[in-house]
Curated annotation (Swiss-Prot):
Zn(2+) binds at residues 34, 36, 49, 52. Belongs to the RNA polymerase beta' chain family. RpoC1 subfamily. Coiled coil: none annotated. This is DNA-directed RNA polymerase subunit gamma.
Amino acid sequence: EVTKPETINYRTLKPEMDGLFCEKIFGPSKDWECHCGKYKRVRHRGIVCERCGVEVTESRVRRHRMGFIKLAAPVSHVWYLKGIPSYVAILLDMPLRDVEQIVYFNCYVVLDPGDHKELKYKQLLTEDEWLEIEDEIYAEESEIENEPVVGIGAEALKQLLEDLNLEEVAEQLREEINGSKGQKRAKLIKRLRVIDNFVATSAR
């Protein structure tokens, strides 16, 4: 995990530990040499330095090793949202246009309709529509006890994806595929393939 915004130490000109160029995370900046200099030369290949935690290997590993950062709020990755096909839209079985409306804070999405008779799960609402519903919920004569829950942005998408039971959805899709034809069948197969890949790799 990258925990510091620093890149290179201006005095030593070495990458800062836990920073964006950290050798412990991405690998050594010099072939066969750890950060602190305890291990040098190819004969120490594969050793992880007990002082600085850097593996003694070739510097080219820095080209493909990946780090990560923890964000304060969820974000949607453009590859999964805008890629062709859009994996997020396929998983949620929603048009990409609707998914974009949620991500770009143009519309709220219903996460739980509660006792409200006119709302449905995954229904989109404009801000004005949601304000009207809120007035209705909090009116004195309101009979709604179980209040509806709505969300917006990537946080709402995260909740929708967490609500999916991939194994159950896959089983349901297989049954639907057996009884469908043409374009509808092709669409169901495409969704099943994406879900099966997530199940096979245990990705969440």
